[in-house]
UniProtKB/Swiss-Prot annotation:
A lipid is attached at residue 23 (N-palmitoyl cysteine). Pfam families: NMT1_2. Probably part of an ABC transporter complex. Residues 1-22 form the signal peptide. Belongs to the bacterial solute-binding protein SsuA/TauA family. The keyword Oxidoreductase does not apply. PROSITE patterns: PROKAR_LIPOPROTEIN. Has shown promise in a 4-component vaccine with SecA (AC C0QZS7), BHWA1_00569 (AC C0QYX7) and FlaAL (AC C0QWY9). Keywords: Cell membrane, Lipoprotein, Membrane, Palmitate, Signal. This is Putative ABC transporter periplasmic binding protein BHWA1_00430.
Amino acid sequence: MRKTVKIITSLVLIACLFLLASCANKGSSSSGDATTLKVAVMPFLNSVPIEYMINNKLDEKYGFKIETVYFPSGGPMNEALGAGLWEVGTLSAASVYSLANYNAHVVADIGHSEGGIEVLVNPDSDILTVKGVNKDFPEVYGDAATLKGKTIAVPTGTISHLNVIHWLRAINVDPNTVNIVHMEFPQAYQALKAKKIDAAALNPPTSFSAEADGMKIVSSLTTLNIPQYDSIIVSDEAFNNKKDTIVLYIKAFLEACDALQADPNMAAQELLNWYTKNGSTSTLEACQSEVQTRPFVTTEEIKNIKTGDSVRITADFFASQSLITEDKLTVVDQNVDTELLGKALN
């Protein structure tokens, strides 16, 4: 009897492995049709142009078809890239992992993502008594004396962590003289309000809520002049096998960005609709603030942006924090492409 059970169990396991392998093979291959793209979307602003493209049939206009694949955030989206489940997507800081670990390619920077990446303090913080100690950053607050012994909460290994490190560097503060603690954004903000910490590194929408509640910005990617972009990321397979379609996708994406950027009220409503569609709660006012501080890159603006610069800034930071190895920096550089954008603009 036991032998029979073992045989049956083995057969079941083999069948499961076969099914998994079949699924993996299906996922790892591109869409059979060279003009169809599996496009990753997330419940954030950077996917609004994709929704606009679909609703306004821009994919049909340019002769290709979008099939969306939904992900809740950049982490799962990257893991799915490794399994070949999508071909084109839009990512910010997480794109470093796409390029370094999955040999994906960044082909265009299409949205400003530095807006709202801020370090905030209570309005009575002594950090606010010192401003512009570094003349290159006149809107940045704090110095070695006011930061000594302070506790700063931030989700480590994120773009907000990069903001903290560059803030300390800008005002010549040794990171060893402050306490940097890992804390997710909502918890960090609650701790700041309760004055259990001295500063919180936040991102939208939490940073906007903090500002509305009277918290003060002491550092941000904007005041530190650190550009960050949401970028169009392409899987290695699609990059090598669907270049003509990717060029058409970039054209359509930029047309969507032009339309959204030309009408901020429409863009805010589109964002609110997107949030609602994906189960998030927001207000039109909050969406208006977000599209104002995180504008889309237009066809004209993109001509003056050096593709991949912000990816390299983030990659350098990730390497300094041992989130990627130093040898991956070369891989990131090699996977920055400007050829397809050039074709899309011509």
